[in-house]
């Protein structure tokens, strides 16, 4: 039987900072092959990915996740080696403990326990794993390309659970049944460079930009709805000029990000911003790049099954949420209508001394195991 604690520690000890894998996926693959899964290793560029499937009939339930992690930063600030997976006082400390190697370990352990009680499961049903090594990076050679490969192989996912750390304060308090979209923008406002002592010979782009940036930052796109928070635009960088104090710069650049709901498209958001810019009569260039589209799984068998199972195991009534950042569910939901995210408490992810309670690993394993039981009840 697979021990989620031991597997989580082994995964953390592989320093798989994007895009390096360092044998992390091999650990998962060995366990899955032992359980009878057929594994397809899918390397795109410098990124390791794999898709594993057990069975070829019935509905296909997919566990999805990522083995890559963000860097540890200044390791001197950690209480222990970030890749030692230190086990102390009921916690495992290490990079990726909650995001999301702990969740991966629980998925595999739950699958092993479920199949031990259902040795003939694959004769009528299917289980699969979609695992990438490029979620924390640009996400160009990861899940997106695996999904393209699955489509070329006519592989279908009926249900998908992404094991991101969705819980807020307690394991089981939050399920993500959707995510906001994300668009990054770069705005350049051009003027005329010159000496500060000759204002009649310059056109100061900073002066031009100030009211424009204020107008854009105060835009109201919507009021939100029962699934999504109001759309939010935040400026992330403003740059103009150099170190000289007597030169009016020739241009100003500003970066921004928009998190938006399913009420909008990237094109409609860009049109709203251009409307403000055109009305300001400034010389500008606007570039916008979509990093993720919004999705929502409003209801259906998977949402209801996850809610009921979490409540059964944890005793909590989980809230459905679309808040927070983006995840690979934004890609998967285009291929699998029933896509939901549920996992560990994410309060320490990406931080110094990221850690997970050992007890939570056991509880999450039980949630995942009982979820499989609920979706695939014994026949007869």
UniProtKB/Swiss-Prot annotation:
Pathway as given in its UniProt record: Amino-acid biosynthesis; L-lysine biosynthesis via DAP pathway; LL-2,6-diaminopimelate from (S)-tetrahydrodipicolinate (succinylase route): step 3/3
Gene Ontology MF annotations: acetylornithine deacetylase activity; cobalt ion binding; succinyl-diaminopimelate desuccinylase activity; zinc ion binding
EC number(s) on file: 3.5.1.18
Cofactor note: Binds 2 Zn(2+) or Co(2+) ions per subunit.
Catalytic activity: N-succinyl-(2S,6S)-2,6-diaminopimelate + H2O = (2S,6S)-2,6-diaminopimelate + succinate
One GO BP annotation of this record: L-arginine biosynthetic process
Positions with a binding annotation for Zn(2+) 2: 99, 136, 350
Active site (catalytic residues): 68, 135 (proton acceptor)
Positions that bind Zn(2+) 1: 66, 99, 164
Pfam families cross-referenced by the UniProt entry: M20_dimer, Peptidase_M20
Cofactor: Zn(2+); Co(2+)
SUPFAM superfamilies per the UniProt record, alphabetical: Bacterial exopeptidase dimerisation domain (SSF55031), Zn-dependent exopeptidases (SSF53187)
Domain of life: Bacteria
CDD domains linked to this entry: M20_DapE_proteobac
Key words of the record: Amino-acid biosynthesis, Cobalt, Diaminopimelate biosynthesis, Hydrolase, Lysine biosynthesis, Metal-binding, Zinc
HAMAP family: DapE
Subunit architecture: Homodimer.
Functional description taken from the UniProt entry: Catalyzes the hydrolysis of N-succinyl-L,L-diaminopimelic acid (SDAP), forming succinate and LL-2,6-diaminopimelate (DAP), an intermediate involved in the bacterial biosynthesis of lysine and meso-diaminopimelic acid, an essential component of bacterial cell walls.
Family classification: Belongs to the peptidase M20A family. DapE subfamily.
PANTHER family: ACETYLORNITHINE DEACETYLASE (PTHR43808), N-ACETYL-L-CITRULLINE DEACETYLASE (PTHR43808:SF31)
Record-given protein name: Succinyl-diaminopimelate desuccinylase
Provenance organism: Magnetococcus marinus (strain ATCC BAA-1437 / JCM 17883 / MC-1)
